[in-house]
């Protein structure tokens, strides 16, 4: 298990590289060029600037999250080929700084969806919250307004330039079915996987968050069966999944440890976090401790350990604790606590395995 930490870049993150360096066991940054809109080529010059920053603290840049996929590709429009060519060029460029994994998603219009970025919990901390009834009855334009007005930082998937065309985007998907989206995803993969494979990069799709349709938009990476269907699209070694325990885990029917055990050899990158699911379908993001949520994080880590997982991991979202002012879900303190919880579990399983061998 190789521990990483998501970082949004200088002047775009409340967490510094100096602070990340002090978290035990973190060896690399999960990074992106967050000022580039979907469809643009990532310039090598800009990529090298990030590498220089990472090199000062001894971090690798093995994991990219995310090179966003342009909506025209998801929609299957004639213009998609030009954007796919740009995507290929970005793959080539990130390979030049040692990238090994590109995490991406294929969610239409919206990335991850929440109704409250700072929902107060019983202990006084705040966390990302999803209120099902609110989403079911809310105009998506209102959610856009609330999310963008409350955010101190631009959030991935909720960039102003992306949401400026919300009306056009929603209308474009009115007649797009899940089968259409699968077809468009396969077309994209057939074009980019050979380039990724040539450069030793694994394309690892992130599950839909939450793992069901929102605002009538199609979503397809939502379950164990969907993961199976996705992985069957290609037998390329560059074709894999970013297994996010919190995204898939928001649906109690998804058995995360079971999914890991079944597909572990196709998981180059893992997001490990916990969510507490309520009977009405709401969920809130909690600490990594199994008892605090609905996902058995101890068994999640055990599933990785017993299968000899050597891929990359990050703690994913955290609560906002100790009065930290930070990007929603991406503060320093709770993610650092999460890392230590994950290491504690991993070390315990390592010790147990050694005792069995002796």
From Swiss-Prot:
InterPro entries per record: Man_deHydtase, Xyl_isomerase-like_sf
Catalysis: reaction(s): D-mannonate = 2-dehydro-3-deoxy-D-gluconate + H2O
Molecular function as annotated in GO: ferrous iron binding; manganese ion binding; mannonate dehydratase activity
Top-level taxon in the UniProt lineage: Bacteria
EC assignment: 4.2.1.8
Family classification: Belongs to the mannonate dehydratase family.
PANTHER family listed in its UniProt record: MANNONATE DEHYDRATASE
UniProt name for this protein: Mannonate dehydratase
């Amino acid at each position: 298990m190789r521990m990483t930490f998501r970082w949004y870049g200088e002047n775009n993150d409340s967490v510094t590289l100096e602070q990340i360096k002090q978290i035990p066991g973190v060896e690399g940054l999960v990074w992106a060029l967050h000022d580039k809109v979907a469809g643009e080529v990532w310039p090598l010059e800009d990529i090298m600037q990030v590498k220089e920053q990472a090199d000062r603290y001894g971090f690798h840049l093995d994991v990219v999250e995310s090179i966003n996929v342009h909506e025209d590709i998801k929609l299957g429009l004639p213009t998609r080929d030009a954007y796919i060519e740009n995507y290929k060029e970005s793959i080539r460029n990130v390979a030049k700084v040692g990238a090994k994994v590109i995490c991406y998603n294929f969610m239409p219009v919206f990335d991850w969806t929440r109704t409250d970025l700072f929902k107060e919990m019983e202990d006084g901390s705040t966390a990302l919250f999803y209120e099902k009834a609110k989403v079911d009855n809310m105009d998506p334009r209102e959610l856009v307004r609330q999310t963008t007005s409350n955010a101190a930082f631009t959030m991935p998937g909720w960039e102003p330039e992306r949401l400026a065309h919300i009306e056009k985007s929603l209308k474009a998907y009115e007649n797009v079915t899940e089968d259409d989206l699968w077809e468009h995803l396969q077309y994209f993969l057939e074009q980019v996987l050979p380039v990724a494979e040539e450069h030793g990069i694994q394309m690892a799709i992130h599950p839909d968050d939450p793992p069901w349709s929102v605002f009538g938009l199609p979503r397809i990476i939502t379950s164990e069966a969907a993961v199976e269907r996705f992985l069957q699209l290609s037998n390329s070694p560059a074709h894999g999944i970013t297994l996010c325990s919190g995204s898939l885990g928001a649906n109690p029917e998804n058995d995360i440890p079971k999914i890991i055990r079944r597909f572990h050899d196709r998981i180059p990158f893992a997001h490990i976090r916990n969510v507490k699911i309520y009977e009405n379908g709401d969920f809130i993001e909690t600490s990594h401790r199994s008892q605090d949520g609905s996902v058995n994080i101890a068994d999640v880590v055990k599933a990785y350990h017993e299968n000899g997982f050597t891929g990359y991991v990050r703690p994913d979202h955290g609560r906002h604790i100790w009065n930290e002012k930070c990007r929603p879900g991406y503060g320093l303190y709770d993610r650092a606590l999460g890392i230590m919880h994950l290491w504690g579990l991993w070390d315990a399983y390592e010790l147990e395995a050694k005792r069995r061998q002796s």
